[in-house]
């Protein structure tokens, strides 16, 4: 199935999430839930849809660049302008086609009041740099962007599970 057919036919659905009631006190205390997921899994969209609907989340913070915002808006108005996005993104990030469609629907329904893009690291890199950026630098930028989100709205932050592990991840000596 091609990308256009996937995004035009997909509709998110609410699913049963066991022990969802455990999350509610955390959300009430901090107004932030961080959800780690495996990139490219279409079922993630149903999880996010359910969390937003059942916990009254009003802001979504996603591990993605603001450069995808125009494409999400095109999906929101049913124009599906693929020229606005690098299609490799769909398998390599939290933004699968299904997730983008889910976000667009939640925005259409005014369920989400705000969308925040927390992965700005690659937007400002020097393409001519000889030394590649450190994975730790990106983690620091992601953390700063998350901490920069004001606590006025209940927020769901979606990131790859690699970023959400409770311990420091080492990569061949690079932290």
Regions found by a protein language model. Give the residues of each.
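Compositional signal for N-terminal targeting/processing segments
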Residues: 1-175
């Amino acid at each position: 199935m091609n990308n256009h057919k996937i995004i035009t036919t997909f509709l998110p659905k609410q699913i049963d999430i066991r022990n969802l009631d455990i999350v509610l006190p955390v959300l009430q205390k901090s107004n932030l839930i961080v959800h780690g997921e495996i990139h490219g899994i279409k079922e993630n969209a149903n999880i996010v849809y359910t969390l937003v609907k059942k916990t009254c989340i009003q802001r979504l913070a996603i591990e993605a660049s603001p450069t995808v915002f125009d494409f999400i808006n095109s999906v929101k108005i049913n124009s599906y302008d693929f020229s606005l996005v690098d299609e490799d993104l769909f398998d390599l990030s939290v933004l699968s086609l299904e997730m983008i469609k889910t976000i667009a629907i939640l925005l259409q329904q005014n369920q989400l009041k705000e969308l925040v893009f927390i992965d700005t690291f690659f937007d400002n890199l020097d393409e001519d740099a000889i030394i590649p950026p450190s994975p730790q630098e990106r983690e620091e930028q992601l953390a700063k962007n998350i901490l920069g989100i004001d606590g006025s709205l209940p927020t769901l932050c979606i990131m790859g599970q690699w970023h959400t592990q409770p311990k420091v991840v080492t990569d061949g000596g690079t932290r």
